[in-house]
Amino acid sequence: MKNTILLLFTAFIFLSGFFGMSAEALADPKADPLAGPFPDADPDPINMKASAAVAKKLLG
């Protein structure tokens, strides 16, 4: 029984890789495969010096 489950799991992993399915695609099949990892993310980087200045001003 244990060997059968291991064999089926291994076959599933092999077939998933063979057909080009990633773990994310298996988890969310409706996701756009051409989109980046975070399509709603802000493209501008966070200005750490400005953030630190605001935090210092707020916290005293």
From Swiss-Prot:
AXPX repeats lie at residues 27-30, 31-34, 35-38, 40-43. The modification Leucine amide is found at residue 59. GO terms for cellular component: extracellular region; membrane; other organism cell membrane. Expressed by the venom gland. One of its GO terms (biological process) is defense response to bacterium. GO terms for molecular function: toxin activity. The keyword Secreted applies. Residues 24-45 form a propeptide. It is found in: Secreted; Target cell membrane. Its main location: secreted. Residues 1-23 form the signal peptide. Keywords: Amidation, Antibiotic, Antimicrobial, Fungicide, G-protein coupled receptor impairing toxin, Immunity, Innate immunity, Mast cell degranulation, Membrane, Repeat, Secreted, Signal, Target cell membrane, Target membrane, Toxin. Antimicrobial peptide. Shows activity against both Gram-positive (S.aureus MIC=1.9-3.75 ug/ml) and -negative (E.coli MIC=15-60 ug/ml) bacteria, as well against fungi (C.albicans MIC=15 ug/ml). Also promotes moderate mast cell degranulation. Does not show hemolytic activity on rabbit and human erythrocytes. Its mast cell degranulation activity may be related to the activation of G-protein coupled receptors in mast cells as well as interaction with other proteins located in cell endosomal membranes in the mast cells. Belongs to the MCD family. Mastoparan subfamily. This is Mastoparan-VB1. It comes from Vespa bicolor.
